[in-house]
Curated annotation (Swiss-Prot):
Residues 883-894, 988-1002, 1144-1193 have a biased composition (Basic and acidic residues). This is Myotubularin-related protein DDB_G0290005. Residues 144-180, 195-222, 248-276, 625-664, 852-864, 899-914, 927-973, 1025-1043, 1091-1109, 1244-1258, 1265-1294 have a biased composition (Low complexity). GO terms for biological process: phosphatidylinositol dephosphorylation. Residues 865-882 have a biased composition (Basic residues). Belongs to the protein-tyrosine phosphatase family. Non-receptor class myotubularin subfamily. Its EC number is 3.1.3.-. Keywords: Coiled coil, Cytoplasm, Hydrolase. It is found in: Cytoplasm. It is an enzyme of class 3 (hydrolase). The lineage of its organism: Eukaryota, Amoebozoa, Evosea, Eumycetozoa, Dictyostelia. It comes from Dictyostelium discoideum. The active site is at C575.
Length: 1324
């Protein structure tokens, strides 16, 4: 229920009914601006959570918007009226629908009753004209096959009229029950007492005499529109009088939904006009309103409203909302629209356009190339100099504010010449202004224009040098675009500049259509579209002149582009006032010349600069006005113009009169629509040059009249600032910028390279030696253009076509949908944007993606650890896992790395004798140097690690007589510390090769992996390096043993053969070299080509060392070293094999557990699927049962057209195979069945016996009190029951014959224009 609070902000007008209606709407909206209304008795309201800004942000406490049948309304929107049993007539197909029409303070929308889908929406600001169509509607409900339990008490008579009266009562009760089921879905409570009263009323109607048929038929008519007192009471709560629509209403209370069952009567004017429109229900005449709603965006819809209180009130509300004369700006819905911003505010469209930033981008200010020529003046900061100009604009630097003030008085509306754009390469400027006030001379205006003409521009010279600015040769083209019919009393050259006073200026007259010619062309176009014919329509469009006006605009645009881009001359555009055609032409020139304006952001800047800031009269041209800023008069003549005022006057003849402003009918013109249409033409001629698509332009046109945003309200920037629109309303640019990533708004063929815009301006280099003058040939111009092309588009004026997707949109209406965000999407014109103007992405739920993510996270540790040795040691792969699986994955990686190190050491120890060894791709540069200088033996291991290459040098030198063992020295303490630690462990192995030491090594490795969990992947590569170093050490030991044996042999031979020592030494050295090559080959598997040269040098050094060591004594400790190496290798192999077996067992167990879990999950999913299937089957069965109990309707719509002689019919099933809808036109209105006329005469003659029962065939709203009094009246009609029985017995013979004919008619596809007598008897 709405709250009944009074507000002081609303001003009521006693003379205008619309003022009171909109004022109450605004007062209610002010109350509900911070809290959404809740309508508890008409339809359920559900909370709808909008998508949050981020997943991490909390849910803010916000008032939830209202929901109607699972459809979300906009914030600040509430329902005014609900109308049941409305027929939505399709214009192209036969998918006519029966549903409910909702009217809110922003729009009206239609929801189908059977499918619960949103079919159509129309914003209140889009309403242009509502026209009544002549014709009638026939609705017939078939009999149900299943009996109803509520009809068991129908046999209260002991008469023999069961064949007729019981059938009628069954039909009545079934239609009542079905309709109550439909309407009860909108309510929250039921009233069984009233249902019982109505059923008792129907059961007792069998005792009536002559008024029997009338009572039954009247109750059946009530079953269509007012099926039962319970549903009727609910309808009256929402539809009877939610707001006082009388013109004399002066109350200040907000609209409320009355809980009392009150009824109102319709006006006599509407009754007289709708006398020919009838709605037949089971053969009983019922009036209907067939309405054709014409919108400003060329959309056409047709509704058929029931001719009762609710239908008439809905029609009156449409007429009142169609009036565009508002008493106050608070009556606009844009002032009530209040999206929730929360803590994080989205983009603010009011602050998007910054004139200083835009002029800096062009290079007019803030740049060394042009900052000395132009300046930004703030003389109009309070809108005193010109009320329709912006606060900041560009003028020449040499013009003072005094001269500017004098020049403004010489132009219409003080709109003096102002620079708005400069060419990037030629530096030619584009200016705009209005025409002069008279023929008198103004020196200040001449100085201003000369300063604009003398601006620095770049022209080609005769020499092949860099082009220089030339001021003396510059000419300024003054483009006069007013039409010849704009000043009929004077010549076309009046109020134009005198060339004698404006030196080096040329005037070009281009006659563009004025606002009156545009309006006439739009009217012709709308008539052709309303009566569209595929054969003649395209030729008739050419006769409207709309396409000719578009081609004229493109031709003048192309001519100005040649002056700016090809010739390098500045241009000044002006018309009479400079806010209609000047805006069109200036915007189109900049759109073709500057690629930045062809993007979404650039196009918004272009409209904000050229249209909004320079004072285009959006509200006046759209036919809207506010009484506070304009005077209102009554417009009684209707000339059929395509404006809101004309539509009001045309409707006033049929319904009620409305008030409009005098300027609304004469000053309306589709100026902005024509500009958007030309932009669409350019997108088709240059499909890769625009970032936005056709739907982007359609959204802008949709909100031109929707009154949802404050962007296009009022006529100037001053008026918007005075009415606080930036703070009280939302900007359309907020919606477009938040939804700019939407695929429907983007052009998939857009080439971004052509639209890359740099902020700095560049000088034009000389590319041709031919100067460009007025006598330059076209080839020379094209050569200059091609050499200095910057994405300039030259349109084709002849390639103009009709924008069929916009002007013929009624042929492709939006698809019906049941999604909760559908109503918001239709209201905004953009999908995937919520009511808070925040874009959200479509959620794609897939079970496989979730399972695959969990499976990949568990298996990534094993796969990455297995294949990590194929990568370089400095590459690291960090996997994101869940917190519960991190420990398991780390343990797996550590164990697997240990097993791999043991296995690799095993393989390497077994393959040392082989010449070719395959190893991982680890590139390490190693050099081996061994030197001996003294008789003592000292072993030194030095490991130097450098980046990017690791070099390990092993030096065997004897410098001191003592034996010393030194550890490694490192240069980088990051990764190489682990290698040094491993080398220390290997040295300990040489000293104590026992089993305890091996266990200590393993413990040390475990401690290392536990202390460095993040470097587990690095340890694998480091361990490989350790194993390689251990092999190198073993090979060195073998070499030492061989050398010692040779020394012993040489000492024995010296005693016997002293002379042959030198020869033997040479032979022995050769043998030693061959033995040294074999271990060196095993080392070269990980060396690069650079290390081979170092090995050859080391061999020469070994030969010299062996010669010096021949005289030394042998060392007996060599045998011990050989035994230690064999024991360590055998123990490492056995321990590694055991660890591998344990790891494999653990992995197998884990795999089994994972398989069991997956099987359990699959079983659970199967159970869930089965449950869901069972639920769906149950729901379908319940729906089928409900549909069987509901009546099935046949709708026949007959539109009267005297021009057509033959009837045209179209059929299609609505709710079942037996039901059908047929729509056809006929020259004659079908008459009633003669039996029905007999019934009417009988009802008129039996007025005394019928009591308070309404006997008129026309449907009128019968009070509930009359329905409750029927039982008392039935008791008084027992005397005439015998006569009724005799009449019914006479009709028994006719029923059997009529049933046969009725069955045959069910199989036919169409109905005759006039009902046959047999059908009438069957229905009776």
């Amino acid at each position: 229920m709405f709250s009944n609070k009074n507000t002081d902000n609303v001003e009521n007008d006693n003379n205008n009914a619309l003022g009171s209606v909109i004022a109450r709407i605004n007062s209610q909206n002010i109350i509900t601006k911070n809290k959404a209304p809740v309508i508890s008795e008409d339809f359920e309201t559900q909370d709808f959570d909008y998508p949050s800004f981020d997943d991490e942000t909390p849910n803010y406490d916000r008032p939830q918007p209202t929901m109607v049948e699972n459809f979300t309304l906009l914030p600040g929107e509430f329902v005014l009226m609900i109308t049941k049993n409305v027929v939505n007539l399709s214009l192209t197909t036969t998918t006519h629908r029966i549903g409910t029409l909702y009217q809110t303070n922003y729009q009206m929308f239609f929801i189908d009753d059977s499918t619960r889908q949103l079919v159509s929406t129309i914003a209140n600001g889009q309403l242009l004209q509502i026209k009544k169509l002549k014709g009638h509607v026939t609705v017939k409900y078939h009999d149900n096959t299943t009996p109803n339990n509520n009809n068991n008490n129908n046999n209260n008579n002991n008469n023999n009229n069961n064949n007729t009266n019981n059938n009628n009562n069954n039909n009545i009760n079934k239609s009542n029950n079905s309709s109550t089921d439909q309407l009860n879905s909108f309510s929250l409570e039921k009233q069984p007492s009233q249902n019982e009263n109505l059923n008792n009323n129907n059961n007792n109607n069998n005792n009536n005499n002559n008024g029997n048929n009338n009572i039954n038929n009247n109750n059946l008519m009530n079953s269509l529109t007012q099926p039962s007192t319970s549903s009727r009471s609910r309808l009256l709560k929402s539809n009877s009088t939610p707001i006082n629509l009388n013109e004399s209403s002066t109350s200040t209370n907000s609209p409320t939904l009355s809980s009392t069952t009150t009824t109102t009567t319709t006006t006599s004017s509407t009754n007289g006009n709708c006398s020919t429109n009838t709605w037949y229900s089971n053969g009983v005449s019922e009036k209907a309103l067939i309405l054709e709603i014409r919108c400003k965006d060329f959309m056409i819809t047709r509704y058929c409203l029931p001719f009762n209180e609710k239908g008439n009130e809905a029609f009156e509300l449409m007429n009142k909302l169609i009036c565009n004369n508002y008493q106050d700006s608070n009556q606009l819905f844009s002032m009530s629209y209040s999206p929730f911003k929360g803590v994080i505010s989205p983009i603010d469209g009011w602050l998007f356009y910054d004139p200083i930033e835009e002029y800096t981008r062009q290079g007019l200010i803030g740049n060394s190339n042009g900052s000395d020529e132009w300046r930004l003046t703030k003389m109009n900061s309070k809108y005193e100099l010109c009320s329709t100009y912006p606060q900041h604009f560009i003028i020449p630097f040499s013009i003072s504010d005094y001269l500017l003030n004098k020049s403004s008085s010489h132009r219409n509306k003080n709109r003096f010449p102002v620079v708005t754009w400069r060419h990037k390469q030629t530096h030619a400027t584009l200016s705009r202004s209005s025409q002069q006030t008279g023929k008198s001379r103004c020196e200040e205006d001449e100085l201003l224009i000369q300063a604009i003409r003398k601006s620095k521009t770049i022209l080609p010279n005769n020499n092949n040098q860099q082009q220089q600015p030339q001021q003396q040769q510059q000419t300024l083209y003054i483009i006069d675009i007013k039409s010849t019919s704009s000043s009929p009393t004077s010549s076309s050259s009046s109020h134009c500049e005198d060339i004698s006073h404006y030196s080096q200026c040329q005037i070009e007259s281009e006659c563009l259509s004025n606002i009156h010619e545009l309006r006439e062309s739009q009217l012709k176009l709308f008539k052709v579209i309303r009566n569209w014919n595929e054969k003649k329509g395209w030729s008739e469009i050419q006769s409207t002149g709309w396409l000719d006006q578009l081609s004229k605009l493109l031709m003048v645009t192309k001519k100005i582009l040649t002056h700016l881009h090809l010739e390098g001359f500045s241009c000044l555009i002006h018309c009479i006032d400079g806010w209609d055609r000047t805006c069109q032409l200036s915007s189109l020139v900049q759109l073709c010349a500057d690629p930045y304006y062809r993007t979404i952001k650039g196009f918004i800047v272009l409209i904000s600069k050229e249209w909004l800031s320079f004072g285009h009269k959006f509200m006046t041209r759209n036919g809207q006005s506010i009484s506070s800023t304009s005077t209102t008069t009554t417009n009684s003549s209707s000339n059929g113009q395509l404006t809101s005022s004309s539509s009001n006057t045309s409707i006033s003849s049929n319904a009620t009169t409305t008030t409009t402003t005098t300027t609304s009918s004469k000053q309306t013109s589709p100026v902005f629509l024509q500009f958007i249409d030309v932009v669409w033409q350019l997108t088709k001629q240059f499909p890769t040059s625009f970032e936005f698509s056709d739907s982007f332009l359609s959204v802008i046109l949709h909100h031109l009249n929707s009154n949802l945003f404050g962007t296009f309200l009022y006529d100037s920037e001053k008026e918007r600032q005075q009415n606080n629109l930036p703070t009280e309303t939302q900007s359309l640019w907020t919606l477009l910028l938040s939804a700019q990533k939407n695929s429907s708004l983007l052009n998939p063929l857009f080439n971004q390279q052509l639209s890359n815009e740099t902020s700095s301006t560049t000088n034009l280099t000389a590319t041709t030696s031919i100067p460009l003058t007025n006598s330059t040939t076209l080839d020379q111009q094209l050569q200059f253009k091609n050499n200095n092309d910057d994405g300039v588009l030259f349109p084709n004026p002849k390639g103009v076509q009709l924008w069929s997707d916009y002007f013929l949109k009624w042929r492709n209406p939006p698809k019906a949908s049941r999604k909760s965000n559908t109503l918001i999407a239709h209201s905004l014109g953009v999908s995937y944007v919520n009511g808070d103007l925040i874009a959200f992405q479509k959620k794609k739920r897939s079970r496989r993606s979730k399972d695959g993510a969990s499976g990949s996270s568990s298996g990534s540790s094993g796969s990455s650890s297995k294949h990590h040795h194929h990568h370089h040691h400095h590459h690291h792969h960090h996997h994101h896992r869940k917190s519960t699986d991190e420990k398991d994955s780390k343990e797996k990686s550590s164990k697997s790395s240990r097993s791999r190190t043991s296995s690799s050491s095993k393989r390497k120890s077994l393959s040392t004798s082989s010449n070719s060894i395959t190893q991982p791709d680890i590139k390490i540069n190693e050099t081996i140097t061994t030197t001996t200088t003294t008789p003592t033996n000292t072993t030194t291991l030095t490991n130097t690690s450098t980046t990017p290459r690791n070099t390990t040098t092993l030096t065997n030198a004897s410098t001191t007589p003592t034996t010393t063992t030194t550890t490694t020295t490192t240069t980088t303490p990051t990764k190489d510390e682990t290698i040094n630690e491993s080398v220390q462990v290997n040295n300990d192995k040489l000293k104590s090769p026992s089993g305890d030491d091996i266990k200590q090594e393993q413990d040390e490795m475990n401690q290392f992996t536990s202390q460095h969990p993040n470097n587990q992947m690095e340890s694998s590569s480091e361990i490989n390096q350790q194993n390689e170093q251990s092999q190198l050490e073993q090979q060195q030991e073998q070499q030492q043993q061989q050398e010692q044996q040779l020394q012993h042999e040489q000492q024995q031979i010296e005693q016997q053969q002293l002379q042959k020592q030198q020869q033997q030494q040479e032979q022995q050295e050769q043998q030693e070299l061959e033995q040294q090559e074999q271990p060196n080959e095993t080392i070269t598997y990980s060396m690069e080509s650079d290390s081979q040269s170092s090995i050859s040098q080391n061999q020469n050094q070994l030969q010299q060392q062996q010669q010096q060591q021949t005289l030394l004594d042998p060392i007996d400790e060599s045998s011990l070293l050989a035994t230690t190496t064999t024991t360590t290798s055998s123990t490492a192999i056995t321990s590694a094999s055991k660890l591998e077996k344990e790891l494999r067992k653990q992995e197998k167990e884990k795999r089994k557990l994972e398989k069991e879990k997956k099987q359990k999950e699959r079983a659970e999913r199967k159970l869930e699927k089965e449950k869901k299937r069972d639920q769906k089957e149950r729901e379908q069965k319940e729906k089928e049962l409900l549909e069987q109990q509901k009546p099935k309707a046949d709708i026949t719509v007959v539109l009267q057209s005297p021009s057509k002689k033959k009837a045209m019919s179209l059929t299609m099933p609505v709710r079942g195979t037996k039901s059908r809808i047929s729509i056809f036109s006929s020259p004659l209105v079908p008459t009633l069945h003669p039996n029905l006329s007999d019934q009417n005469s009988q009802t008129n003659s039996s007025g005394d016996n019928s009591g308070n029962v309404n006997n008129s065939p026309n449907l009128t709203s019968t009070p509930i009190s009359n329905l409750s009094n029927n039982n008392n009246n039935n008791n008084n009609s027992n005397e005439n029951s015998n006569n009724n029985n005799n009449n019914n017995n006479n009709n028994n013979d006719n029923t059997s014959f009529s049933k046969r004919i009725f069955k045959t008619l069910r199989g036919t596809k169409t109905f005759n224009r006039e009902p046959t007598p047999t059908v009438g008897t069957a229905l009776n």
